[in-house]
């Protein structure tokens, strides 16, 4: 039993890193713009398929698949901001209207993916996968890479937001958009940029997930919910909170498999979210915005 729990904990730490990366990609956008960007799930989907098309169909290196995924995701994210969210803001639409528009966009996008790519999973290969054994505990080089890449990107984004002028502008708009505009910060440019940044981070998460699983038309939904959960559990606008929440979610889901079937993982995830909302409405380390 002890070996099983250690193995599940290792799995949980790895998945927790990916959950944190997913959460970061959505948290950046939500904490800055206040938009409940449900269509962010399309970013994961588009990135996964872009990598598959470049790597598997065109026969190009996986590195180019990553680059293509980021480009496609950034273009799509910016298009959603400029083509849907900004016009709705100009018209004075409520957050509920914007949310419904985002949800409708997601449903339409998934339907188009279903028509174009068919409902069959598309595998993505190209990463050298070997098994690392430490005693009776094992994990693959791909999952180790997922862990390292996820935390490296999270650290990089944290440093960017903390130390650069544009990063401070993003934080200023997220904290007080009216004051930021009074200081000469162009809110619309910041909104567009955070959609690009969040989409780029989301693309990396989407490709890492596709490498471990596969690309399919409904892949965005299983990824967007962990992004929501770690954002609200960790705290809106808190990168450290998202990182901790991702780790907790990954551990909780995987360790529970020692006693429960995989069908209960979603229930556990939302139980954590519900408990966090009741006990810590602002999240573990959030500002409460």
Q: What function would you assign to each model-found segment?
A:
Residues 4-57, 83-93, 97, 235-239:
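Single transmembrane alpha-helix segments in multi-pass membrane proteins
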Residues 5, 9, 42-46, 63-71, ...:
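Hydrophobic alpha-helical transmembrane segments
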Residues 21-25, 42-46, 203-204, 216-236, ...:
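Hydrophobic alpha-helical segments embedded in the membrane of multi-pass proteins
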Residues 87, 91-163, 189-190, 255, ...:
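Transmembrane helix-bundle core of multi-pass membrane transporters
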């Amino acid at each position: 039993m002890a070996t099983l729990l250690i193995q599940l904990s290792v799995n949980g730490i790895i998945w927790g890193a990916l959950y944190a990366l997913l959460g970061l990609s959505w948290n950046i956008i939500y904490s800055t713009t206040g938009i409940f960007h449900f269509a962010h799930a399309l970013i994961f989907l588009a990135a996964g398929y872009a990598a598959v098309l470049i790597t598997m169909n065109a026969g190009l290196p996986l590195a180019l698949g990553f680059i293509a995924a980021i480009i496609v995701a950034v273009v799509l994210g910016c298009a959603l901001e400029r083509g849907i969210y900004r016009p709705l803001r100009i018209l004075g639409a409520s957050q509920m209207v914007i949310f419904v528009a985002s949800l409708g966009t997601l449903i339409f996008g998934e339907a188009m993916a279903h028509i174009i790519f068919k409902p069959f999973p598309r595998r993505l290969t190209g990463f050298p996968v070997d098994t690392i054994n430490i005693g009776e505990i094992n994990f693959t080089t791909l999952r180790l890479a997922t862990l390292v890449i996820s935390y490296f990107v999270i650290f990089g984004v944290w440093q960017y937001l903390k130390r650069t002028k544009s990063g401070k502008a993003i934080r200023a708009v997220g904290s007080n958009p009216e004051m930021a505009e009074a200081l000469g910060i162009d809110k619309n440019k910041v909104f567009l940029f955070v959609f690009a940044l969040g989409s780029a981070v989301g693309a990396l998460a989407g490709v890492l997930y596709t490498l471990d699983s596969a690309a399919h038309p409904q892949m965005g939904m299983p990824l967007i919910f962990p992004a929501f959960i770690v954002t609200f559990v960790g705290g809106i606008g808190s990168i450290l909170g998202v990182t901790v929440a991702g780790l907790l979610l990954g551990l909780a889901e995987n360790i529970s498999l020692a006693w429960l079937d995989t069908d209960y993982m979603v229930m556990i995830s939302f139980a954590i979210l519900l408990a966090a909302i009741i006990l810590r409405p602002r999240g573990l380390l959030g500002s409460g915005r």
